[in-house]
Amino acid sequence: MGVNQSVGFPPVTGPHLVGCGDVMEGQNLQGSFFRLFYPCQKAEETMEQPLWIPRYEYCTGLAEYLQFNKRCGGLLFNLAVGSCRLPVSWNGPFKTKDSGYPLIIFSHGLGAFRTLYSAFCMELASRGFVVAVPEHRDRSAATTYFCKQAPEENQPTNESLQEEWIPFRRVEEGEKEFHVRNPQVHQRVSECLRVLKILQEVTAGQTVFNILPGGLDLMTLKGNIDMSRVAVMGHSFGGATAILALAKETQFRCAVALDAWMFPLERDFYPKARGPVFFINTEKFQTMESVNLMKKICAQHEQSRIITVLGSVHRSQTDFAFVTGNLIGKFFSTETRGSLDPYEGQEVMVRAMLAFLQKHLDLKEDYNQWNNLIEGIGPSLTPGAPHHLSSL
């Protein structure tokens, strides 16, 4: 009956092969869990390719977030895409670089998790970035987990760790959504800063233990990240996270906000906002109120920009844009792709990002050939926001 779907990830266009691995640091809720995408060497043997949806629990988490029956929806999600794999080397050998690679911290959106932006992350890694994607523990992820020591074990080992799962937090009837989402966005920023600190320590040669069995060996990163060239990026709730993180941490030199959901940011934040921020919006998500808040930030920072990708929808900036077949689309109340071909959309957004990152991280690349895209001049782009905006 055509249950199996596939994910047609765009082939990467950069000069580097891409590796990825997961890192969990700390044995409590305050620890850190993130996926790392990075330039890797060609391995002598065939490397394993990781699953796109890393575990069955994420299928049930997605079903629950989308308000489907957890058991049936999870089963269908798993049948549809549970066997899809990422075209990267799992824990592949890190490709060393004396001057280090620039770093991007990428924050996922509401109801997402660390693997749902793999198309962007793989492409950026192929272009010579290390990309870290924290899986947020503020209960905005579809689901996530942490590992803690089993109570009966005296001698801690990786094998004696117990998983504790964290479900998605829905706003209850009668609750004000802002009072839920605002503390979450602040926690998300703290989690991004913890990942930044971990990678800073590893780069400096300090020992940081990855407690995941068979997880990525962080010591291979020593001296290979250029901590003077760091950007923060995110989609939707992650876009708001990136904007707030830029204001809180001066080590971030710029932010890229993909279809940022501005709602969780408190109004008195805006005078303290830093730039430059590059807002890359889709055509069918933003409201005039939201765009006006973006304009407030742009008015304070002349290098900040807003562009809109015409023919795109909110999920055009996630991996769901590349899922073929109709089954997954039935789970979503809104479209997973717009009228713009998703591969064309990915290409123009990545090129715009790269031009912006070159400009503000002082990269020695040729991405300035796409500087016109930063101004919203190019195929399927418009500067600012279109006149006819959707109402959420």
Curated annotation (Swiss-Prot):
What is its subcellular localisation?
Cytoplasm; Membrane; Endoplasmic reticulum membrane
Keywords noted in UniProt: Cytoplasm, Endoplasmic reticulum, Hydrolase, Lipid degradation, Lipid metabolism, Lipoprotein, Membrane, Myristate, Transferase
GO biological process per UniProt:
blood coagulation; lipid catabolic process; lipid metabolic process
Q: Which SUPFAM superfamilies match?
A: alpha/beta-Hydrolases
Acetylation as a keyword of this entry, yes or no, is: no
* GO molecular-function term, one example from the UniProt record: phospholipid binding
Q: What is its main location?
A: cytoplasm
State the PROSITE patterns in the record: LIPASE_SER (PS00120)
Catalyzes what? Answer: a 1-O-alkyl-2-acetyl-sn-glycero-3-phosphocholine + H2O = a 1-O-alkyl-sn-glycero-3-phosphocholine + acetate + H(+); a 1-O-alkyl-2-acyl-sn-glycero-3-phosphocholine + H2O = a 1-O-alkyl-sn-glycero-3-phosphocholine + a fatty acid + H(+); 1-O-hexadecyl-2-acetyl-sn-glycero-3-phosphocholine + H2O = 1-O-hexadecyl-sn-glycero-3-phosphocholine + acetate + H(+); 1-O-hexadecyl-2-acetyl-sn-glycero-3-phosphocholine + a 1-O-(1Z-alkenyl)-sn-glycero-3-phosphoethanolamine = 1-O-(1Z-alkenyl)-2-acetyl-sn-glycero-3-phosphoethanolamine + 1-O-hexadecyl-sn-glycero-3-phosphocholine
Q: What is its EC number?
A: 3.1.1.47, 2.3.1.149
**Gene Ontology, cellular component aspect:** cytoplasm; endoplasmic reticulum membrane
The record's disulfide annotation reads: none
The record places the active site at 236 (nucleophile), 259 (charge relay system), 314 (charge relay system)
Q: How does it sit in the membrane?
A: Lipid-anchor
Write out the function statement from the record.
Answer: Catalyzes the hydrolyze of the acetyl group at the sn-2 position of platelet-activating factor (PAF) and its analogs, leading to their inactivation. Hydrolyzes propionyl and butyroyl moieties approximately half as effectively as PAF. Also catalyzes transacetylation of the acetyl group from platelet-activating factor (PAF) to lysoplasmalogen and to sphingosine, producing plasmalogen analogs of PAF and N-acetylsphingosine (C2-ceramide) respectively. Has a marked selectivity for phospholipids with short acyl chains at the sn-2 position.
- Membership in a protein family: Belongs to the serine esterase family.
| Name listed for the protein in its UniProt record | Platelet-activating factor acetylhydrolase 2, cytoplasmic
